[in-house]
């Protein structure tokens, strides 16, 4: 699973994509409030031996953090091919997310540069973690409270959706070298240094998007997106617009994970992964893709300020 690839066009993956909804950044002129995210996390481990670990679902890892200036959510999907070498890539993914979480807690972080979190978190891992090897994708999104703008940095095939009034406002782009080989951050053992695919955090695609009261933000690893089509995700979440009760958001996250897990085990289902495999002339046939699944679901609430 590990190989070197000529990384053509690396620079184009670093472009900043702007997507403002008619400059309605939470309509702060009328709300005059402070935005926050009502968040819920759920997931499922493909390998039950890896279940039950803190901030991990199998080889996936995640974090959420709230600060006065920002709220940040992140997921990382450890690359499973390392198991062939006796390495648990979930440890790498968890350390990467732990580093990013700690950096998001710093007083000067205001949510406007999650890619810098990823850069610094990755370099901390390389420089300070002992015998933490492996690789993972990563997706970070941060809410900049002062103007209710969502900033993102996505590397690989994890990703996020923003929904408004039951429609997809934005979906992140995935980065692949070839089919089923996503961009990934790596720290290999010395013996594998020149045999392992490794991209740079600076290559993460960055976007910024103005949010409004009631918008939904869905951050997930490919265990969700490879098994559930976008239209079904929209269907599952369309009644959640404007929901501010955390228990309702949690139930919706639970349903998404349950759905993805059921579909991943079906052999008669044309999953998004199966369709992409066919489009790439791969002999995958039909069926879902058993995988670790991590979902972070958030609803945007803007509290009213008293005059």
From Swiss-Prot:
Give the binding site residues for Mn(2+) 1. Answer: 77-78
Source organism superkingdom: Eukaryota
The catalytic activity, as recorded, is: O-phospho-L-seryl-[protein] + H2O = L-seryl-[protein] + phosphate; O-phospho-L-threonyl-[protein] + H2O = L-threonyl-[protein] + phosphate
Q: Which InterPro entries match?
A: PPM-type-like_dom_sf, PPM-type_phosphatase-like_dom, PPTC7
Any one Gene Ontology biological process term?
dephosphorylation
| SMART domains with a match to the protein in the record | PP2C_SIG, PP2Cc
Q: What Enzyme Commission number(s) appear in the record?
A: 3.1.3.16
Give the cofactors, semicolon-separated: Mg(2+); Mn(2+)
- Alphabetized UniProt keyword annotations: Hydrolase, Magnesium, Manganese, Metal-binding, Protein phosphatase
Spell out the PROSITE patterns in the cross-references. PPM_2
PPM-type phosphatase domain location is 41-300
The keyword Manganese is annotated on this UniProt entry: yes
Q: What class of enzyme is it?
A: hydrolase
Amino acids binding Mn(2+) 2: 77, 222
Drop me one GO molecular function for this one.
protein serine/threonine phosphatase activity
UniProt GO cellular component terms: mitochondrion
Task: Give the similarity note.
Answer: Belongs to the PP2C family.
What is the name listed in the Swiss-Prot or TrEMBL entry for this protein?
Protein phosphatase PTC7 homolog fig
Q: Which species is this record about?
A: Drosophila grimshawi
């Amino acid at each position: 699973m590990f190989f070197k690839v000529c990384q053509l066009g690396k620079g184009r993956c670093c472009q900043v994509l702007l997507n403002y909804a008619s400059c309605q950044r939470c309509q702060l002129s009328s709300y005059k409030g402070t935005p926050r995210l009502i968040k819920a996390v759920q997931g499922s481990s493909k390998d039950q031996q890896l279940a039950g670990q803190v901030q991990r679902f199998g080889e996936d890892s995640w974090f959420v953090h709230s600060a006065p200036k920002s709220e940040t959510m992140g997921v990382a999907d450890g690359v499973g091919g390392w198991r062939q070498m006796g390495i648990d890539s979930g440890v790498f993914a968890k350390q990467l997310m732990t580093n990013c979480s700690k950096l998001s807690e710093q007083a000067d972080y205001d949510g406007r540069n999650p890619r810098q979190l990823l850069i610094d978190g990755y370099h901390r891992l390389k420089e300070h973690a002992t015998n933490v090897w492996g690789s993972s994708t990563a997706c970070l999104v941060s809410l900049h409270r002062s103007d209710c703008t969502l900033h993102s940095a996505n590397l690989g095939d994890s990703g996020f959706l923003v929904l408004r009034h039951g429609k997809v406002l934005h979906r992140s782009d995935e980065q692949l070298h070839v089919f089923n080989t996503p961009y990934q951050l790596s720290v290999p053992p010395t013996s594998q240094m020149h045999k392992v695919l490794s991209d740079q955090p600076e290559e993460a695609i960055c976007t910024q998007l103005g949010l409004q009261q009631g918008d939904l933000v869905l951050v997930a690893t490919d265990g969700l997106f490879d098994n559930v089509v976008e239209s079904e995700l929209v269907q599952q979440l369309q009644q959640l617009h404007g929901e501010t009760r955390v228990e309702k958001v949690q139930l919706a996250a639970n349903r998404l994970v349950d759905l993805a897990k059921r579909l991943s085990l079906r052999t008669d289902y044309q999953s998004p992964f199966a369709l992409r495999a066919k489009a790439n002339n791969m002999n995958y046939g039909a069926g879902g893709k058993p995988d670790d699944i991590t979902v972070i679901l958030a609803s945007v609430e803007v509290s009213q300020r008293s005059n």
